[in-house]
């Protein structure tokens, strides 16, 4: 009897802010390096919260990465020796990330992507729903609600301590907003048409 090793697949780690997505991505990448696998890690160039050269979790763990402006740049950094490809903050890439990641998985790479599944409005965020549908495995993480301590699946955007309006832009770069994890019942979006 032969044991066949599966070659090439897509794993998605998703959830709200503060749920441990980047931390889980870093953990999986570090495990691959312990197994002597060649890894390459990427994030969108617009993510410069902690470092432009590393994926950094909110608890301070980090791993070196390449900051890229477009998904196609991944192909410039990988080779036949690459085993595992990690991509953080996947929701900030345009729709070409879906084809790029599925192509990489089809070519035999283990692809691990992490990102927010819902935006601050509580609506599906960018390409993440498509990646959820196409991934072989989906890990949905939850944070802890900052109001009541229940499991939190939403990200609350606060501007000057108040919930952001539904009409605010989904992506703010360099703004002075703050975020909290919230459960369904304590997530507030003034002006939400629902």
From Swiss-Prot:
Q: Where is the signal peptide?
A: none
Q: Where in the cell is it found?
A: Cytoplasm
Which residues bind ATP per the record?
15-22, 88-91
| Positions with a binding annotation for Zn(2+) | 145, 148, 183, 186
Q: Which GO terms describe its molecular function?
A: ATP binding; thymidine kinase activity; zinc ion binding
What's the top EC group for this one?
transferase
Which reaction equation describes what this protein catalyses?
thymidine + ATP = dTMP + ADP + H(+)
- Annotated Gene3D superfamilies: 3.30.60.20, P-loop containing nucleotide triphosphate hydrolases
- InterPro entries named in the record: P-loop_NTPase (IPR027417), Thymidine_kinase (IPR001267), Thymidine_kinase_CS (IPR020633)
Principal localisation: cytoplasm
For this record, an example GO cellular component is: cytosol
GO biological-process terms attached to the record: DNA biosynthetic process; thymidine metabolic process
Write one Pfam family the protein is assigned to: TK
Name the UniProt key words of this record, in alphabetical order: ATP-binding, Cytoplasm, DNA synthesis, Kinase, Metal-binding, Nucleotide-binding, Transferase, Zinc
Q: What is its EC number?
A: 2.7.1.21
Write out the similarity annotation: Belongs to the thymidine kinase family.
Q: How does it assemble?
A: Homotetramer.
Q: Kindly give the PANTHER family that the UniProt entry links to this protein.
A: THYMIDINE KINASE (PTHR11441), THYMIDINE KINASE, CYTOSOLIC (PTHR11441:SF0)
From the Swiss-Prot or TrEMBL record, give the protein name: Thymidine kinase
Which organism encodes this protein? Bacillus licheniformis (strain ATCC 14580 / DSM 13 / JCM 2505 / CCUG 7422 / NBRC 12200 / NCIMB 9375 / NCTC 10341 / NRRL NRS-1264 / Gibson 46)
């Amino acid at each position: 009897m032969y044991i066949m090793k599966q070659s090439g697949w897509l794993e998605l780690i998703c959830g709200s802010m503060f749920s441990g997505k980047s931390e889980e991505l870093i953990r999986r990448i570090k495990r691959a390096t312990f197994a002597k696998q060649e890894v390459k890690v990427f994030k969108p160039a617009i993510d410069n919260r902690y470092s432009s050269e590393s994926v950094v979790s909110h608890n301070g763990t980090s791993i070196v990465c390449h900051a890229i402006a477009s998904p196609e740049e991944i192909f410039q950094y990988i080779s036949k020796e690459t085993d595992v490809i990690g991509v953080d903050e996947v929701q900030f890439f345009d729709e070409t990330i879906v084809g790029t990641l599925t192509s990489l998985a089809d070519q035999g790479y283990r692809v691990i992507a992490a990102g927010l599944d819902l935006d601050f409005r509580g609506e599906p965020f960018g390409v993440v729903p498509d990646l959820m549908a196409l991934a072989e495995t989906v890990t949905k993480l939850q944070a802890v609600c900052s109001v009541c301590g229940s499991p939190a699946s939403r990200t609350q955007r606060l501007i000057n301590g108040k919930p952001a309006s539904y009409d605010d832009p989904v992506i703010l770069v360099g703004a002075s907003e703050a975020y909290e994890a919230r459960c369904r019942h304590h997530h507030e979006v003034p002006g939400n048409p629902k």
